[in-house]
Every structure is written in C-alpha cells, then in structure tokens.
Amino acid sequence: MNTELLIIGGGASGICAGIQAARMGIKTLIIEESSMVGGMFNAAGVTAFDGNKYAVGGGIFGEFRKKIEDHYGGPDNTFTGWISLTCFEPRVGQKALDELIASAGDNLTIWYNTKLVSIIKEANTIKGAIVEPQNSGDSEVSKFRSSEVPVYADITVEATEYGDVLYLAGLPFRFGRESTFESGEPSAPHDPDEIIQDLTYCAILKKDPDNIKIVPPSENYDPERFVNSTAEHSNSSDEVYLNHKLHNWESFISYATLPGDKYLLNWPFRSNDYPTTAEIYDDFEKRKWHLEKAKELTRDYIHYMQTKLGHPEWGIDESAYDTPDNFPPIPYVRESRRGIGNYYMREWDVVPDEYTLR
C-alpha cells in the first residue's frame, strides 16, 4: 500500500490535517485505532471546547464550530455550560465532522479500528508504518490478505494520542515540564520534572427523572475518595488548603451542561481525573488495564453523584455513543510524548506582547 501522506492518529490534529491535505489534492490515509475520529473534541467526549471566543475561530476548527452553532441556531444556544462558549452533543459533533470529511473528497481515506504495529524506517528516514486491523468488518484494511499491512508514504505525520510514533521510531521525546533555564519561559518551574498530566475517561450524562438507572459501583468504590469535589460533601471550607474552589451543586451541574439536558462529566476537582504514569505510554498491555481503571473511576463518580450527592436523575446518556457501554471510544489524554526537534513551541510563541500582532 502506497500513499502520499500517512497520518497516524485520527484525533483532533490528525483529522484536521487530513481534511486540509486532501482538499489540497494530496492522497491522504488516516490510521485510527478506535471506531471514531475527532479525538478530544468528539471521540474522547470533551464536547465543550477548551478556548473561547477567538481561540478556535479559524481553519478547520472554525468550520467545525460554525456547523455546530448553525445546528443549534447560533452561538447563544451553544453557551449552555459556563466552561465553554461552544457546548454540543456528540451526535451533533459527529454530523459536523462527517460533513467536513465529505468535503475532502476521494483524496481522503480513513481506516478505523486499525492499530499501529511498527514504523518503517530506512536509515534515519521514516518511510511509513505497519498497521493491523482490530475489527476487519469495520475497516477498509480488511481487503488486504495479510493481518499486518505495510503502508509506505512520502510523508508520515505523528498524530497519535500518546506519541506512539515517536516511541516506536526511536525518536527523542520528553514528558513533564522543562526548567525555565532550558526553555527561557518565565512561567516554567525552576527545576524540570516528569509529572504527566492526568487523563480522564469522560462520560456524557442525561437528566431523565422518569428513567432512573443507578450505575453499579466497583468493588473499590469509596465515596470518601470524592470528598471535597463539591461543597455538597466536604470536610473543609478552607479553599487555600484544598487548592480549589468548593462549588455547590448548581455550579457543578452547570459547569459543562450540554444542549438537551445533558452533561459532560469532566469535573477537575477530586472526581474522575485518573493519575497518569509513564507505563501507560510505554506498555500497551498495561495501557489497556489503566484505561479500564480510569473508566471504573468515572462509573464510581457517577454512582457517587446519584447516591451520595442525591441526584439519581442524572445517568449515562445511552444515545451518545455507539459503544457497548455508551462511553466515548477513547479517553481524554491531556499529555502526549513531545518530540525533541530543532525547534519546539515556547511561551513566547503564543503570549501576546507589544512586539507581535497577537
């Protein structure tokens, strides 16, 4: 199999790169491990944009946002949660993304449910990748006889959620924060660290008091794990000690309210953020185990909402995703491996100052 452009990962960056490249006449193949593209803003369930007003107003993101706003009748109708000006249901996001994919025409091919196995290299040059279908019934890759398919490309793009291309290609990368002495960034720490941001298995909830379904807790469930996630169940009012504000129920449930009496569960305070370790990145089998534990944590928090916080009317939205458990097909991975190249983005590249047009 040969293509001009191979994009490994159909997340937010990968799908946008693929659409634009195909529009420019480049034969493009996207390899996506899950059943859904869109990454953070759809497949991972974060259907409330990080960044407001002008932050996602241009390019493919701007087109995507405009389609969502048009669906709901304007931007005022997507400002349903105080976390974002653009909140939307996953099905609406999928429809908007499908339209953008269609606009790319025949130059764009997407192989879903297809796993990255290894990177093809010649000397110091990446020539493509070997991939493997995980569900041949759902993937165009099934037309090939071999279970592992080599894909050769003029250009290969790293767009995975974890930076797996960097790892498998043996390229240099880093985790954590650089020191201010290395980066020159005033906001960077004095000493570097390898602290990796938490990941979150988000969930879309729906308010339905006539159809209450209590989510069963795990065997590890302990409601005290979530103490101080809101003011409704707390043992301290010292927000300096807690290092965050204590929100009441109304503030909590309006945080990421979606249209249609729905809610994005991605609460940042002592709820369903899952501590991330390097082995999630380095060991693919342990990654699966950790992701199940992250999903378990989210289920436990939903149970906690329904029981300890006294709101059984909020349950998992069974219409949000075509997955067996109605969860998003992938987690929200905040931090990928970061390649160490000739240049990397720094604070001064994005912060406005008097010498730039930003």
Model regions: which residues?
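Flavin (FAD/FMN)-binding glycine-rich loop and adjacent Rossmann-like elements that form
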Residues: 113, 135, 144-155, 159-358
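Beta1/beta-strand and adjacent pyrophosphate-binding region of the FAD-binding site
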Residues: 1-13
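Glycine-rich phosphate-binding loop of nucleotide-binding enzymes
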Residues: 12, 127-129, 159-160, 164
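Conserved beta-strand-loop-beta-strand element in the redox core of flavoprotein oxidoreductases
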Residues: 120-150
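Soluble non-cytosolic domains of exported or imported proteins
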Residues: 12, 87-92, 288, 292
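Conserved N-terminal/central alpha/beta ligand/cofactor-binding core
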Residues: 20, 26-27, 32-118, 174, ...
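Membrane-embedded transmembrane-helix bundle of lipid-linked glycan/lipid transferases
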Residues: 6-8, 17, 22, 120-125, ...
